[in-house]
Amino acid sequence: NELLYQVHLTAVIDEGAVIGQDTRIWHFCHVCAGAEIGKNCSLGQNVMVAAGAKVGDNVKIQNNVAVYSGVTVEDDVFLGPSCVFTNVSNPRSQVSRQSIYEKTLVRRGVTVGANATIVCGITLGRYAFVAAGAVVTTDITDYGFVVGIPGRLSGHMSRHGHKLIFDKANRAVCPESSLRYEWVGESVRCLDLDEDVPLPENLSVGSRDYRSFEKNLLADE
């Protein structure tokens, strides 16, 4: 039978793995029996998806990432190179905890930067942004921007990955997309789009790189 997804010759796909249409699996990957991967995903070199792990649609997993049992990744997530998940908070070689893996939920649209570590048992809210090298030990709110070791909230990011600058009315505008955001209590929401659906086609291609926007902000100051 013709596969509906693409697999490199060096990748290993166990019988019983579920993989969606148009997903691309590159060199030296291993998708275990019982793993679920959605459609239109990309798995870079040396990615492992374990039994019981779930990956949604349009997820980009960069090189050297292991998605362990107990991890659920929703749609439109970006997992940067060599980022790390765990599924036991107190591992010991002599103590088996395979039946009590702790759950980690990565909500729609999240970005996890290169070499970041996500400690198990937490939820990364929709469109949260984890900076490269951060160590995240607690839940992140929707659109939250987390940096450092241990990870700390350093603001909020738009769906296009730009830091939101809120005015006195707790409103902010993404400098790239012009989408409006509102900060109410401890949560941020987009005023112009349904947050549970993909970006419309006219907003799904970047127009300028992040550094150019950053320079404009500094010039305005």
Labelled PLM ranges:
Residues 138-139:
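Loop-to-transmembrane alpha-helix entry segments
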Residues 114, 132-133:
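Active-site-proximal glycine-rich helix-loop-beta segment
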Residues 2-9, 14-17, 24-123, 150, ...:
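Flexible, glycine/small-residue-enriched loop-and-beta-strand segment within the central core
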Residues 1-10, 22, 71, 76, ...:
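Terminal amphipathic alpha-helical/low-complexity segments used for targeting or macromolecular assembly
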